């Protein structure tokens, strides 16, 4: 921050949604690059893989934590991808593909997914994921 000189690294991504190989290699490059920093890291984005899959485990089993689970208070934790559809069918799994990941040195106070629809319309095909953090 300008006030106290605190430095951190914020990286954002949108991994490929069609090619599993591109997604796998993209994540590997991100993690390899991010772990080189001595400063705290915040890695955000549309990762195009679901919570619990192998890539999610790779992302969160090392130096990064999913802010949803690191948060002192989880205000909501719903679906992050809507595809502009108001209802998820019973046989469709929740589509949580957007994450805020943090390294040591980052405290997550709150986490939430903002699932409001102004005027009943989706402003995007993704809901905003918000974390209040301290570095």
What is each stretch, according to the model?
Residues 1-7, 16-33:
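Soluble catalytic domains of enzymes that build or remodel membrane lipids, polysaccharides, and related
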Residues 17, 103-105, 135:
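Non-catalytic surface loops within mature trypsin-like serine protease
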Residues 1-11, 15, 99, 107, ...:
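Structured beta-strand-rich core segments of catalytic domains in phosphoester-bond hydrolases
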Residues 49-123:
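Active site of divalent-metal-dependent phosphoester/diester hydrolases
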Residues 9-13, 27-55, 67, 101, ...:
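Active-site beta-strand/loop signature of hydrolases that rely on acidic residues for catalysis
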Residues 18-22, 47, 89:
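Extracytoplasmic/periplasmic, Sec-exported soluble proteins
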